Amino acid sequence: FNRIADMFPDAPFFYLSTSPWNVESSIRHFITNHGFPEGPLLLRDLDPRPKTFIPSGVQHKLEYAEQLMADFPDMKFILIGDDGQKDPTTYATIARRYPGRVLAIGIRQLSPREVTGNFGSVAGRVATQPMPVTDVPVFTGTTGSNIMKTMLPYLRAAQNGD
């Protein structure tokens, strides 16, 4: 991800997550310890009460992404997430609603162990999401490094007008 930061030195990194604010310090620790570029965290409020007006994680991510598009109308975005929740659908929606604003989409494919989590069975499985069809190039891989191996050459070519 630092290579993306090097390619686009004036572009900010936004970390948009469905995680609640009470885990902010853990996420910041992860970002720092793994050498990710600095950037603001956009997390969601946690409300333990059932059926409240606080948006779901998926709705939170879509609303924040749309707000970023509105706040930075001249900025283009690279969207990176995973297939464990609704990132593919959310990112395809953003790409369709804001044509020409999304340069690329990266989706990390979760491993079977990540999908089953601590449950260790299909009963505890989090359904992975396929990537909907979009006009934006989509790069997939099981790690961020895998995604970058194919995404970076594309971004370089796009940056050079090739």
Cite the ranges covered by each PLM segment.
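C-terminal cap/substrate-recognition subdomain and adjoining C-terminal extension
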Residues: 11, 19-162
